[in-house]
Amino acid sequence: NIRWGRTYEAFGEDVELQVLFASPLIEGYQGDDVAAPQNVGATAKHFIADGATEDGVDRANAVISEAELRAMHLPGFVDAIESGAVSVMASFSSVNGEPVHGSKALLTDLLKDELGFDGVVLTDWEGVAMSGLTVKQGLQAGIDMFMLVQSWQKGVPEIVRLVEAGEVPMSRIDDAVTRILRMKL
């Protein structure tokens, strides 16, 4: 959609171009050894259907079928994952009414489990709060790292409280920390 306001953050709506550009870009950023001092880790963003929102409105809802999601919006991410991207950033948008930042079906079931992504799933800038979600919803959906730029003083204690209260299992935190450390090391 040419009215989409964040076209500068994408390779375009052509699936072949997404796949054509994703791998070389990631290889250029990460090189043969992402830990080498001259290289940086690549983040594939914005997962998923970020450019398919109704009327091209930024941070809106994408009303699409499962078939369209997989055919038009997934291939670039599959290529990015196969090319070794160390992280994937969630989209501010919603898919069929469900905010991506709070979607276990998209972030855990599809991205982590089905596609086998073992890197870090991170929020966009204050993405959980801006999506009207809680830290708990983000954690349960599969967010590993939160960009709590303005709200970190509340977010960090909230994560501790959720674990201590048994609302989020320690195994979920262990998984997130493992992914973050794998990326850093």
Over which residues does each language-model region extend?
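Glycoside hydrolase catalytic-domain context in secreted enzymes
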Residues: 1-185
